[in-house]
């Protein structure tokens, strides 16, 4: 089950405008690590749009998730998320029609091992 994974996972449904451009997404599934990362309980996330929860939504996430949904691309992003004040590594990929799955890591929490 995704609930036991040690990293954040979500399945989102993209919301498009008339020109087929992504304008938001709705959280359809999230595991407990996602709630910790987003700093919101799952019952506030699931069924709600990202834009309704985070007024400072950065469109860079939309463009990447849009590509995964519309073109079936698997993408990896490493960028700062002003919404939750964290540096993230995100892997997104198509799941169901209109949806994409995302694996998220807060890279500031990752301990890197140096080989000597």
Task: State where each predicted segment sits.
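PAS/LOV and related PAS-like sensory modules
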Residues: 1-18, 113-116
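PAS-family sensory domains
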Residues: 15-18, 79-86, 88-96, 103
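Alpha-helical sensory/transduction surfaces in regulatory modules that relay environmental signals to outputs
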Residues: 37, 44-46, 50-53, 68
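Terminal output helix/cap of sensory domains in signal transduction proteins
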Residues: 53-80
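PAS/PAS-like sensory domain cap-loop motif
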Residues: 17-22, 34-45
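N-terminal capping loop/helix in small sensory signaling domains highlighted by a polar->aromatic N-x2-3-F motif
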Residues: 27-34
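Sensory coupling linkers of modular signal transduction proteins
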Residues: 98-116
């Amino acid at each position: 089950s995704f609930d036991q994974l040690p990293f954040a996972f979500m399945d989102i449904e993209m919301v498009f405008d008339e020109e087929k451009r992504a304008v938001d997404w709705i959280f359809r599934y999230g595991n407990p690590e996602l709630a910790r990362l987003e700093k919101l309980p799952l019952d506030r996330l699931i069924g709600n749009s990202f834009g309704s929860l985070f007024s400072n939504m950065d469109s860079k996430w939309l463009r990447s998730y849009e590509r995964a949904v519309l073109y079936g691309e698997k993408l990896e992003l490493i960028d700062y998320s002003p919404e939750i004040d964290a540096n993230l590594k995100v892997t997104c990929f198509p799941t169901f029609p209109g949806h994409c799955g995302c694996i998220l890591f807060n890279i500031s929490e990752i301990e890197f091992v140096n080989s000597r």
